[in-house]
């Protein structure tokens, strides 16, 4: 296949087979947003502890929301090749639904690189906090479905997950 026919995406974090941080020096700082979601599936005993307010550590949903906000700001410390960028806005919604705890995080920046990883990290850290807060009630809690719902801005353009 000739280079002009190659439609595979470029993996920008590798050069000559070695990891690298992508150079964004020449990229324009523009408004970028990303929204991610994830779920925490609760066994009956964990759900009962949440609904009954009997978690010994306090309100799991409030702690998860705060953890998600903190996670969005600490992404570059956790995701090794992620740029430390200014998070100019973050919203983490944590709701108890029939299927479990749903977490949706939206993160905004005006930077030369996107905030998809910040949104995904916010959801993941929020979910881990739900687990931590309810693990005394059940160890069978499951974190699932962490994914990017949408992104705007940047060279790659806008994205919306097909089933949203």
Curated annotation (Swiss-Prot):
Residues annotated as catalytic: 132
Associated pathway: Cofactor biosynthesis; molybdopterin biosynthesis
Gene Ontology terms: biological process: Mo-molybdopterin cofactor biosynthetic process
Positions bound to substrate: 81-83, 117-118
Annotated InterPro entries: MoaC, MoaC_bact/euk, MoaC_sf, Mopterin_CF_biosynth-C_dom
One MF term in the entry's GO annotations: cyclic pyranopterin monophosphate synthase activity
Catalysed reactions, semicolon-separated: (8S)-3',8-cyclo-7,8-dihydroguanosine 5'-triphosphate = cyclic pyranopterin phosphate + diphosphate
EC number from the UniProt entry: 4.6.1.17
Record's keyword terms, sorted: Lyase, Molybdenum cofactor biosynthesis
Known function: Catalyzes the conversion of (8S)-3',8-cyclo-7,8-dihydroguanosine 5'-triphosphate to cyclic pyranopterin monophosphate (cPMP).
Self-association state and partner proteins as the record states: Homohexamer; trimer of dimers.
Family (UniProt): Belongs to the MoaC family.
Protein name per the record: Cyclic pyranopterin monophosphate synthase
Gene: moaC
